[in-house]
């Protein structure tokens, strides 16, 4: 009891310190980008969320857009088979909230930003909603949220779970903390065997762990719509043009690609730059200007009829817009401090996939993509040659598309396995 109390107090102190360290950056985003204005009351517990109706309640949580989006087939199936349940979906980012509202409010879900995980804030919210099941997407588990839910009798599951090498080392160093942090989870449904070994390394029993594969490979027909013609028309790309979509770009990715793009003087090669964070738009623009690349901004009505390069300064369109690509590159993979983003989205939109050397967040998936030749791993030295070859050889591009489709087909049973495990837990609960 004393140990748990001490752990809770130390955790609170850590969160408070982290907040003050991040405060200048937070206030900068508030005053210059208008972020967090709509969500601060919920975040700080000033305003409590309310869930309508009666019946058992399942609370889903994901860090941001990607983690929340992968819940779509799960919520749809849950609603079909267990219509008496109520849904809550939370996320830590405003972009995630917008995505969750678009996807889930029509299903009757209550969506809001997750309050801060300080014991004095989150515990009262958990007590008010009293969830019967809590489901964390991928790995964004919060200690007080989890432990208070368990104290009230909820079941807690991690789905599509993963644990990075960095996090594993950190929790291994503090093995007792790692065990205490994840031990309240009833089940951990993980992406692969490597993540299983990492969780076991920090003290989680193998009896709690299931490996089902990556749920992001699952495509429901409603989510797999390919809008290639729609986006190419909207971007004003002709049938002779070749489009490279550079998604989730960070400044270091831009630096590498700017050098390559400067070699393309052919007006039929179009480049769409999609920043990961819109607040870094000016930095991206300066890097392109420095490289002598002329570009337009989507928000200002620019199109590929006027420019060979466009910056897509709009949120929430990247996955859809991959469908217009002749080549797709996933950013964050030329920045060792980032380690990559979702490698599957281009495949789901039937675009040839490329990524850089830094893929810590999905290293196992990246290795399997390379083995199946469903994705191309490039570095600074090979990037220009690989891109040039793909642009000039339609057969090669089509071969990567077909291998990507085959890869997804082989992996798509991961959702069904995950659902069957969860369903067995739901049906045996006494609500």
UniProtKB/Swiss-Prot annotation:
* Role this protein plays: Involved in lipopolysaccharide (LPS) biosynthesis. Catalyzes the transfer of three 3-deoxy-D-manno-octulosonate (Kdo) residues from CMP-Kdo to lipid IV(A), the tetraacyldisaccharide-1,4'-bisphosphate precursor of lipid A. Thus generates the genus-specific LPS epitope of Chlamydia, composed of the trisaccharide alpha-Kdo-(2->8)-alpha-Kdo-(2->4)-alpha-Kdo.
Query: Which compartments does it reside in?
Result: Cell inner membrane
This protein is called what?
3-deoxy-D-manno-octulosonic acid transferase
The UniProt annotation places CMP binding at 275-276, 315-317, 342-345
Active site per UniProt: 67 (proton acceptor)
Q: How does it sit in the membrane?
A: Single-pass membrane protein
- The residues that cross the membrane are 5-27
> E.C. number, please?
2.4.99.12, 2.4.99.13, 2.4.99.14
Enzyme class per UniProt: transferase
Q: Which organism is it from?
A: Chlamydia trachomatis serovar L2 (strain ATCC VR-902B / DSM 19102 / 434/Bu)
Q: What is the lineage of its organism?
A: Bacteria, Pseudomonadati, Chlamydiota, Chlamydiia, Chlamydiales
**UniProt-listed Pfam families:** Glycos_transf_N
Q: Name one GO molecular function term.
A: Kdo transferase activity
Keywords, A to Z, come to: Cell inner membrane, Cell membrane, Lipopolysaccharide biosynthesis, Membrane, Signal-anchor, Transferase, Transmembrane, Transmembrane helix
The UniProt entry, under PANTHER family, shows:
3-DEOXY-D-MANNO-OCTULOSONIC ACID TRANSFERASE, MITOCHONDRIAL-RELATED, 3-DEOXY-MANNO-OCTULOSONATE CYTIDYLYLTRANSFERASE
Q: What is one term from the GO cellular component aspect held by the record?
A: plasma membrane
């Amino acid at each position: 009891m004393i140990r748990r109390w001490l752990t809770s107090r130390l955790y609170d102190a850590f969160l408070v310190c982290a907040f003050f360290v991040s405060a200048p950056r937070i206030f900068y985003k508030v005053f210059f980008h208008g972020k967090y204005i709509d969500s601060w009351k919920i975040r700080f517990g000033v305003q409590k969320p309310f869930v309508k109706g009666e019946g058992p309640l399942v609370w889903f949580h994901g860090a941001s857009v990607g983690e929340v989006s992968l819940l779509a087939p799960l919520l749809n199936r849950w609603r079909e088979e267990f219509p008496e349940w109520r849904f809550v979906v939370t996320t830590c980012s405003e972009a995630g909230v917008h995505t969750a509202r678009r996807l889930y409010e029509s299903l009757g879900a209550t969506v809001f930003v997750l309050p801060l995980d300080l014991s004095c804030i989150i515990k009262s919210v958990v007590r008010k909603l009293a969830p019967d099941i809590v489901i964390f997407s991928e790995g964004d588990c919060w200690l007080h949220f989890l432990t208070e839910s368990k104290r009230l009798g909820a079941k807690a599951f991690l789905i599509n779970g993963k644990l990075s090498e960095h996090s594993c080392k950190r929790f291994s160093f503090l093995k007792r903390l790692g065990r205490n942090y994840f031990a309240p989870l009833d089940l951990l449904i993980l992406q692969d065997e490597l993540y299983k070994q990492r969780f076991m390394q920090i003290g989680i029993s193998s009896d709690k762990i299931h490996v089902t594969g990556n749920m992001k490979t699952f495509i429901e027909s409603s989510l797999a719509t390919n809008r290639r013609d729609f986006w190419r028309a909207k971007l004003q790309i002709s049938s002779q043009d070749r489009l490279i979509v550079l998604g989730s770009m960070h400044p270091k990715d831009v630096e590498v690609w700017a050098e390559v793009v400067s070699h393309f003087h052919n007006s039929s090669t179009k480049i769409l730059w999609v920043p990961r964070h819109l607040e870094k738009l000016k930095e991206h623009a300066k890097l392109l200007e420095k490289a002598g690349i002329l570009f337009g901004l989507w928000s200002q009505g620019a199109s590929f009829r006027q420019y060979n390069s466009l910056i897509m300064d709009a949120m929430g369109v990247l996955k859809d817009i991959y469908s217009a690509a002749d080549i797709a590159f996933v950013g964050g993979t030329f920045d060792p401090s980032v380690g990559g983003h979702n490698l599957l989205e281009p495949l789901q939109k039937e675009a040839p996939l490329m990524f850089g050397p830094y893929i810590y967040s999905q290293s196992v998936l990246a290795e399997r993509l390379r083995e199946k030749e469903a994705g191309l791993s490039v570095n600074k030295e090979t990037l220009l040659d690989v891109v040039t070859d793909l642009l000039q050889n339609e057969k090669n591009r089509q071969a990567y598309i077909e291998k990507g489709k085959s890869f997804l087909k082989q992996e798509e049973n991961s959702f069904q396995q995950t659902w069957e495990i969860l369903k067995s837990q739901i049906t045996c609960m006494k609500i």
